[in-house]
């Protein structure tokens, strides 16, 4: 066994089991009633949430296989796990047609698989009498896929989303949740180019969200018309009309890889801890920046430096990052910035300095003189800095299963703290 003398520990692990998720309120299945004065200004009780007595627990079936490996007297410890988790009867909110009188209903919807691996490596890099340095690196890679949805006659039994009639007579379906597709996708318009000439404006596609305001003449051209400085959006189905049928896949809000690196240094009574974490493989629709660009005149936002990259008369459109800027996008800019589009879709990968802390434990000889068993002083900072391409407050602002935006949500707080722990 001399060949593997450097292996100090090896342990294989495996498990298989089922767990239930009962994250259902006591009365969610029974519906809700609310008091309203909508009926002739008289108080009345109305049904505000549809009951669903068939609502059940989620059931997750998971397989885990892995091993722990210790090397060089456990100076290096490695752990790797493979997991395959299938969640059935997924609890979700399903959008209902307006004719139902309700917006949505809490229901069980289909089957989803989460599959990937976790890895962790801990190393004791330096071990001396007065100085030590230890590191721990973790990483998780996971992909998800919708396996089964209730039969509804649509392509892939798609729930929600859009059905678009293409010019060749075929139907293209996208958005919502569909079998064989991952969760977390979001859609929007894609810019074709910035209109910079009267000829381009005259030949622009009819845009159902445009009010047709011409800022050069201060006149309305008519609903659907475009003018110089506006975006020309790409036409998905080729009908020369821009509407909800022209939504493209812009990205996925769920990172496929997350992890962190923790380093701990000790020197006599001092302990320095530095923790970094990261997320990779996802996108964000930057609603915070979008709000600043499209609705400045409401007085609730400040001007971002990004407006300096907007197109102006005489600029090379190929070098302009954004369409022409105005303080009133809805009326004067024909909704160039208000609608979801690739203009504000950004790669959301980040590396964050999550925490740095410094502790100092006073020597026992000194503590004995003042009658204390322990005294530890701490200085710490959290959420100190992001390395990311996301413009604005934080790449972690705003996320959900179908959309990721940063409008009106609070970012992780950057904070600094001091502490003193006394043991009597």
Locate the predicted segments by residue.
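Extracellular/periplasmic, surface-exposed regions of secreted and cell-surface proteins
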Residues: 1-177, 340-424
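Conserved small-residue
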Residues: 107, 124-251, 293, 311-317
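A short local loop/turn or secondary-structure capping micro-motif enriched for an aromatic residue
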Residues: 87-88, 251-253, 281-283, 395-397
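Extracytoplasmic gating/loop element in the C-terminal half of outer-membrane beta-barrel translocons
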Residues: 279-376
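Active-site-adjacent bridging/hinge elements
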Residues: 38-43, 91-95, 116, 234-241, ...
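Membrane-proximal, glycine/serine-rich, low-complexity loop/turn segments characteristic
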Residues: 23-36, 153-157, 178, 182, ...
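Subset of outer-membrane beta-barrel
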Residues: 72-76, 126-131, 256-290, 365-367, ...
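Conserved SET/PR-domain catalytic core that frames the SAM/AdoMet-binding pocket
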Residues: 136, 245, 255-269, 354-359
